[in-house]
């Protein structure tokens, strides 16, 4: 099983919808600054041994975050969804609106 972590801002999630069942943990604010609470919230909800897929708008930010977890924390089960939520929209994936 995989845990999907939507790292986009609330505004981005509200605009496009989310993957049903995904966890919503904003990693960067609208200015691109890392949100300090992200790590605590992440650690409360996810174990470093879990299979995790980070989701961003187009996949770049989630890829950087996943690589950071692997390189800095040795968490080998961290992944990024290539193309991000925009790829799912192109494929007419059924996103849930909050």
Residue spans for each PLM region:
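Rhodanese-like catalytic fold shared by cysteine-dependent sulfurtransferases
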Residues: 10-51, 60-98
């Amino acid at each position: 099983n995989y845990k999907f972590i939507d790292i986009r801002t609330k505004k981005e999630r509200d605009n496009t919808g989310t993957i049903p069942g995904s966890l919503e943990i904003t990693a960067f604010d609208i200015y691109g600054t890392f949100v300090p609470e992200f790590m605590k919230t992440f650690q409360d909800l996810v174990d470093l041994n879990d299979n995790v897929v980070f989701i961003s708008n187009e996949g770049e930010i989630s890829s950087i975050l996943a690589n950071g977890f692997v390189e800095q924390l040795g968490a080998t089960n961290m992944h990024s969804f290539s193309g991000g939520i925009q790829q799912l929209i192109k494929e007419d994936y059924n996103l849930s609106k909050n």
